[in-house]
């Protein structure tokens, strides 16, 4: 199932109920991080689903469908958040559509407030070339922050093998900017 949403009109699961405080969430990371560090990806996902319930989602760039497939096998019906920046290749959109059609997930295709044409009119053509930071803020950072607002934790497909900056990425971490628990069940996976 695919749900297309815009930044102006989003309704996340659980956004009407009060969740844990940032201190409580950080305590969960502190308590469980080391214990889950060597756990299989499925165990990490099971823990996150049991701990956060409907306040747990997955973000996916659709570079592949591994994480969506893995999480949906453990937590059928989970929300999978995809940022449709307006700049994706057709293959990426095809993967998104295949995930929505073949996996038991609730795919949320999130779009920025402005279309690419509206952004070009407001900021000039090809903002990603002239001011990539502003472009990312408008097309990725702000929409993701809003999309995650109703959740306490989210799973990412981050892997330590991807870059040297991610070599020490924990499977369970605290994202202070987002005020959320970041779950990386694939962190220990290699190429």
Per-range role (PLM):
Residues 2-191:
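Nucleotide-activated chemistry modules centered on ATP-dependent adenylation/adenylyltransferase
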């Amino acid at each position: 199932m695919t749900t297309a949403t815009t930044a102006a009109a989003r309704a996340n699961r659980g956004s009407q109920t009060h969740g844990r405080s940032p201190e409580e969430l950080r305590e969960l990371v502190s308590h469980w991080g080391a214990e889950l560090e060597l756990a299989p990806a499925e165990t990490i996902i099971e823990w996150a689903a049991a701990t956060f319930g409907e306040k747990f989602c997955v973000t996916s760039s659709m570079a592949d469908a591994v994480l969506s497939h893995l999480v949906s096998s453990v937590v059928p019906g989970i929300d999978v958040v995809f940022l449709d920046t307006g700049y994706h290749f057709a293959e990426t959109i095809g993967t998104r559509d295949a995930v929505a059609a073949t996996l038991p997930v609730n795919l949320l295709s999130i779009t920025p407030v402005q279309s690419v044409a509206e952004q070009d009119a407001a900021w000039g053509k090809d903002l990603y070339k002239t001011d990539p930071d502003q472009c990312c803020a408008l097309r990725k950072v702000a929409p993701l922050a809003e999309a995650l607002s109703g959740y306490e934790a989210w799973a990412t497909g981050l892997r330590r093998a991807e870059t040297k900056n991610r070599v020490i990425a924990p499977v369970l971490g605290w994202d202070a900017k987002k005020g959320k628990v970041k779950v990386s069940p694939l962190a220990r996976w290699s190429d």
